[in-house]
């Protein structure tokens, strides 16, 4: 069942987990507005409380159509809540077919939107420092949104730019200068990461484990061995652009203004029917008004613009996926109650509400948590009941050598390692829908493409029991 959170708001499902907490989907039971709520346990984040304050402060600065909106924050005891846009289109990695990629026209469109978001961030002096498909979300109109500013920092203030020295990010996406333990400029680092994202979109795989001479794939790239994977799968025009982006020397790396002049970047590609677009401004009228209201009532700490950055922080995981929905159909007062609500109640195991068949009623029911289900391809119906489906999953996990445990209700947590020997954790929910069992996979920690590879492997092993019925989500 849905868990009451603030007046008229319920927590209906977990969107993701991180080192210090999780992200929950909150839905207004009257208006059906949806907001992502990042819940941080400050007791678990005791070693880096300033990082949380910094993340809040940076989020407050942001307002762009290709950046996840921030509605406000609230502290209750040792729990910090951040209220963010809910993106029902899911993560970009879900649109990338392992070892194949996506249609070139889709990759170009997403890359355009990624560039627009990064140009905006750099324009206000912010560098993201962890650009990767797991941190790029899609709204209900398939517009790309940059999310997760936990590693972001200010590199320019009052027209004065500072060099950075903190090594952070996700190794396959970081620029080579980060690994040299010297100071570096911020903007070329984000540009490099965007090039790796473009490679993943076009080829369905990452080019290397890390950009260092100890990595054979990276050495091959520097020696221009483009007859190897992933480069041989990429057409000559986008490959020419990647040759200009993935340049080891930062000063020789192409800048975003020059990327926008590139032949492939400006090449008209057949996109078919044009998708409807969100409003061209950064914030919708109602959410902008809401934003002004909460900003005048909430206390934000200033950004620390000091030049020293002492920690080494690399991520092989998927941080909390922030997701978003626009609130222009209703006034700000409903979300205002969510941000400034007095009574918060925390579920001990929030995902139990996903497996209660009584909630899965008629379409349009505000009590149906699947009304706001994130769109993703990693789910299927089975021909069996819940018990038999669970038994088949168990047998498959044992054959594949996975570690697994049953957690909340009909949920299983699976742990394994990917091809790079990094930890990969995903959760599987068995949900009764229309007298059928939906098996829903969600990445909890690790690389998105590797997660999809394992999903396809499991689905292949279960081919005899997988139903041919399509899963159409999200329901709107």
From Swiss-Prot:
The keyword Transcription does not apply. The active site is at residue 130. It comes from the Eukaryota. Residues 391-476 are annotated as: Autoinhibitory region. Activated through phosphorylation predominantly by ATR but also by ATM in response to DNA damage or inhibition of DNA replication. Activation is modulated by several mediators including CLSPN, BRCA1 and FEM1B. Proteolytic cleavage at the C-terminus by SPRTN during normal DNA replication activates the protein kinase activity. One of its GO terms (molecular function) is ATP binding. SUPFAM superfamilies: Protein kinase-like (PK-like) (SSF56112). GO terms for cellular component: centrosome; chromatin; chromosome, telomeric region; condensed nuclear chromosome; cytoplasm; nucleoplasm; nucleus; protein-containing complex. It is found in: Nucleus; Chromosome; Cytoplasm; Cytoplasm, Cytoskeleton, Microtubule organizing center, Centrosome. The modification Phosphoserine is found at residues 280, 286, 296, 301, 317, 345, 463, 467-468. Keywords: ATP-binding, Cell cycle, Chromosome, Cytoplasm, Cytoskeleton, DNA damage, DNA repair, Isopeptide bond, Kinase, Nucleotide-binding, Nucleus, Phosphoprotein, Serine/threonine-protein kinase, Transferase, Ubl conjugation. The keyword DNA repair applies. Interacts (phosphorylated by ATR) with RAD51. Interacts with and phosphorylates CLSPN, an adapter protein that regulates the ATR-dependent phosphorylation of CHEK1. Interacts with BRCA1. Interacts with and phosphorylates CDC25A, CDC25B and CDC25C. Interacts with FBXO6, which regulates CHEK1. Interacts with PPM1D, which regulates CHEK1 through dephosphorylation. Interacts with TIMELESS; DNA damage-dependent. Interacts with FEM1B; activates CHEK1 in response to stress. Interacts with TLK1. Interacts with XPO1 and YWHAZ. Interacts with CDK5RAP3; antagonizes CHEK1. The autoinhibitory region (AIR) inhibits the activity of the kinase domain. Serine/threonine-protein kinase which is required for checkpoint-mediated cell cycle arrest and activation of DNA repair in response to the presence of DNA damage or unreplicated DNA. May also negatively regulate cell cycle progression during unperturbed cell cycles. This regulation is achieved by a number of mechanisms that together help to preserve the integrity of the genome. Recognizes the substrate consensus sequence [R-X-X-S/T]. Binds to and phosphorylates CDC25A, CDC25B and CDC25C. This is Serine/threonine-protein kinase Chk1. It comes from Mus musculus (Mouse).
């Amino acid at each position: 069942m849905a868990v009451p959170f603030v007046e008229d708001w319920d927590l209906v499902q977990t969107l993701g987990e991180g080192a210090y907490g999780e992200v929950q989907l909150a839905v207004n039971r009257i208006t059906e507005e949806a907001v992502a709520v990042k819940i941080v346990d400050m007791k678990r984040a005791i070693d880096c409380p300033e990082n949380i304050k910094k993340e809040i402060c940076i989020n407050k600065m942001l307002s762009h159509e290709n950046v996840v909106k921030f509605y406000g924050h609230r502290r209750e005891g040792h729990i910090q809540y951040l209220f963010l846009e809910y993106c029902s289109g899911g993560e970009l990695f879900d649109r990338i077919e392992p070892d194949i990629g996506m249609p070139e026209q889709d990759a170009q469109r997403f890359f355009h939107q990624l560039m627009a978001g990064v140009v905006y961030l750099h324009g206000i002096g912010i560098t993201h420092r962890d650009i990767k498909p797991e941190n790029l979300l899609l709204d209900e109109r398939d517009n790309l949104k940059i999310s997760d500013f936990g590693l972001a920092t200010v590199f320019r203030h009052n027209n004065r730019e500072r060099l950075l020295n903190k090594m952070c990010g996700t190794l396959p996406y970081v620029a080579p200068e980060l690994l040299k333990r010297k100071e570096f400029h911020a903007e070329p680092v984000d540009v490099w990461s965007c090039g790796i994202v473009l490679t993943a979109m076009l080829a369905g795989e990452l080019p290397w484990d890390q950009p260092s001479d100890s990595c054979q794939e990276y050495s091959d790239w520097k020696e221009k061995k483009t007859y190897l994977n992933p480069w041989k799968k990429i057409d000559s025009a986008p490959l020419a652009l990647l040759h200009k982006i993935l340049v080891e020397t930062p000063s020789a790396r192409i800048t975003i203004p020059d990327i926008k002049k590139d032949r492939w970047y400006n090449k008209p590609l057949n996109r078919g029917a044009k998708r409807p677009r969100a409003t061209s401004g950064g914030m919708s009228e109602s959410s902008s008004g809401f934003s002004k209201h909460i900003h005048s009532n909430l206390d934000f700490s200033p950004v620390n613009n000091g030049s020293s950055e002492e920690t080494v922080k690399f991520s092989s995981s998927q941080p909390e996926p922030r997701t978003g929905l626009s609130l222009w159909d209703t006034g700000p007062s409903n979300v205002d109650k969510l941000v400034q609500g007095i009574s918060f109640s925390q579920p001990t195991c929030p995902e139990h509400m996903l497996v209660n068949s009584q909630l899965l009623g008629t379409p349009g029911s505000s009590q149906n948590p699947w009304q706001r289900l994130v769109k993703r391809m990693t789910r299927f119906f089975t021909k069996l009941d819940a018990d038999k489906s669970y038994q088949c999953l168990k047998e498959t996990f044992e054959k594949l050598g996975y570690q697994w445990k049953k957690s909340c209700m009909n949920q299983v947590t699976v742990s394994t390692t990917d091809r790079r020997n990094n930890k990969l954790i995903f959760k599987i929910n068995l949900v009764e829908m229309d007298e059928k069992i939906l098996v829903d996979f969600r990445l909890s920690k690790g690389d998105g493409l590797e997660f999809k590879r394992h999903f396809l492997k499991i689905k292949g092993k279960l081919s005899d029991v997988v139903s041919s019925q399509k899963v159409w989500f999200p329901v709107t």
